[in-house]
Amino acid sequence: MLVRQLDDILGTDADVKGETGTWASRRLLLKKDGMGFSLHDTIIYPGTETHLWYKNHLEAVYCIHGKGEIELVPSGELIPIRPGTMYALDKHDEHLLRASEELRLVCVFNPPLTGREDHDEDGAYPVLDD
């Protein structure tokens, strides 16, 4: 059984800050854990917009704090996010994630992340080996 506390991850290599300065991802489960998915406690900073397009991964997200919205690209459809909202990017959906308040999101990725990933110029994570 794996048991981790968020406090044990903060300030370690598993506490990743995006180069864009718009998010932080506390990576609770990673590829090396052998679960077949990775699990993240993610903060999106207020007043930010992040372009995301996970071409290599599927992601499910559950909001536990804050408010924001997703804008689907290219349709422009807006989807509000608030506590209790779940969305799943089951079609590798390109989107803009905006936080009007600090968002705290629980995110699951398949295939799992190794922990070293950051978004590329298209907003995607590469698929990395251990």
Curated annotation (Swiss-Prot):
GO molecular function per UniProt: ectoine synthase activity
Signal peptide span: none
EC number of this enzyme: 4.2.1.108
Pathway assignment: Amine and polyamine biosynthesis; ectoine biosynthesis; L-ectoine from L-aspartate 4-semialdehyde: step 3/3
The keyword Lyase belongs to this UniProt entry's keyword annotation: yes
Catalytic activity: (2S)-4-acetamido-2-aminobutanoate = L-ectoine + H2O
Alphabetically ordered keywords of this record: Lyase
Task performed by this protein: Catalyzes the circularization of gamma-N-acetyl-alpha,gamma-diaminobutyric acid (ADABA) to ectoine (1,4,5,6-tetrahydro-2-methyl-4-pyrimidine carboxylic acid), which is an excellent osmoprotectant.
NCBIfam families membership: PRK13290.1
PANTHER family documented for this protein: L-ECTOINE SYNTHASE (PTHR39289:SF1), PTHR39289
HAMAP family recorded: Ectoine_synth
The name this protein goes by in its record: L-ectoine synthase
The organism of origin for this protein: Desulfatibacillum aliphaticivorans
Gene symbol of the encoding locus: ectC
